[in-house]
Design a protein with these regions (language model features):
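Short, surface-exposed, charged/polar-biased interaction segments
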Residues: 38, 42, 54-57, 92, ...
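Accessory beta->alpha helical hairpin/"wing" motif in late/C-terminal subdomains of nucleic-acid enzymes
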Residues: 86-124
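Short, highly charged low-complexity linear segments
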Residues: 72-82, 92-103, 131-145
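Conserved, aromatic- and glycine-enriched, well-ordered alpha/beta core segments
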Residues: 5-93
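Exposed, interaction-prone assembly regions rather than primary DNA-binding/catalytic cores
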Residues: 110-163
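Short alpha-helix boundary/capping motifs
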Residues: 64-65, 106-107, 129
Length: 163
């Protein structure tokens, strides 16, 4: 049987990126989209006063470290369907939702979308004035802590089975 990546697969990431570009109404670099994508799910890692929409799991920072291929595939999928545009300049490459992308995203509905949009708005409010460089530096200085609350989980499992 073929194993399929259900969580954080290309389609899910593409929808999340479209949600980010549609909600924030601004063109963003790949780096910023990657950062927003992570914090849209785990906002409490950026601001402990906020609630994350996904549960805290061990080693969740690995989803940030290992997502580059999936992000690029998701952007390629969105570009190929004219749901986003790419703005190229000498300084950067930025992506923005097209009218078609905005219309498609508007057709989606449900409680998860509401939570995701709320989380994206909060993340954008917290991060919009920060540079990509600042956010990258913040991530690399903090990511060791994200998921470390489960550091001794395996020790507890061993104790539970010793008798």
């Amino acid at each position: 049987m073929e194993r399929r990546k259900v969580l954080n697969g290309t389609f899910e990431v593409a929808l999340r990126l479209l949600a980010i570009m549609t909600t924030c109404k601004s063109a963003m670099t790949v780096e910023r989209l990657t950062i927003y994508s992570y914090f849209a799910l785990y906002l409490s890692d950026y601001n402990q006063e906020e609630n994350s929409i996904h549960p805290e799991i061990p080693y969740r920072n690995s989803s940030l470290i290992n997502c580059n291929d999936t992000i690029m595939q998701a952007l390629e999928m969105l570009l190929s369907r004219n749901l986003i545009d790419c703005d190229m300049s000498v300084a950067s490459l930025k992506f923005r939702a097209t009218e078609t992308g905005i219309a498609l995203y508007g057709q989606l509905d449900g409680p998860y979308k509401e939570k995701l949009v709320c989380s994206i708005k909060k993340a954008h409010t917290l991060m919009k004035s920060k540079s990509d460089r600042y956010l990258n530096n913040y991530i690399y200085s903090q990511m060791g802590q994200w998921g470390s609350e489960f550091e001794y989980e395996s020790v507890l499992k061993e104790i539970a089975y010793e008798e």
